[in-house]
């Protein structure tokens, strides 16, 4: 049995290093649903999904992380948002043709990576860094180095499993306030770098870890499910509508007869007719919900 759509945390007993392993298939497919992305964009979204899952698992508080790539290339934006419950959503915006063999930098052009950490309670933090590195994993590792965080390495794979898109990855991180040996960390990095896509996608986590670290003492903790979950709702759309000037809303109604608000993340449509809009301004959004 494989470990699709689960995140696993593990700890090396003899080293000051922690690890994570995640694979996603159903969640990945749901991110791709309702969109006709070019192959390199699909791959990048899979990598972003894995990276965001691994990063949110490092949070010591309730909240979410958004990893966003943006630039002036044919791929204007690619973003994944996830929280400490491993609830993920994501979207990409393509503005011109992308060749099947396009690299990260060819897609993004001159761009940056924006990482936003938003605790449920407390201050929001945002880091903006140049895209240094040929791959997403290398760019994220550069982010960790620049922000003087704990030594961290990521290993990300994408492909297919049982005819479905699949992505997986691993993270190694030195434990805080530990006198770790750099050679020990490098040793574990070399072992982890040998992980194959088919192992991540097709084997249980304990077997993957045994194949990689069979000479090490590793503690594997209970897994956490990874799911696709969009936070859109009719109420959120109503709240957004009510902030617009009344004249603009009236113009939209006059033009189309109703206002159709579309969620890029999940594809849901929220339709407001004239009566719905009138109810917004009287403080009653009503109970009916139209989804198409």
From Swiss-Prot:
CDD domains: Hsp33 (cd00498). Under oxidizing conditions two disulfide bonds are formed involving the reactive cysteines. Under reducing conditions zinc is bound to the reactive cysteines and the protein is inactive. It holds the Pfam family HSP33. One of its GO terms (biological process) is protein refolding. GO terms for molecular function: protein folding chaperone; unfolded protein binding. InterPro entries: Heat_shock_Hsp33, Heat_shock_Hsp33_C, Heat_shock_Hsp33_N, Hsp33_helix_hairpin_bin_dom_sf. GO terms for cellular component: cytoplasm. Belongs to the HSP33 family. Redox regulated molecular chaperone. Protects both thermally unfolding and oxidatively damaged proteins from irreversible aggregation. Plays an important role in the bacterial defense system toward oxidative stress. This is 33 kDa chaperonin. It comes from Serratia proteamaculans (strain 568). The gene is hslO.
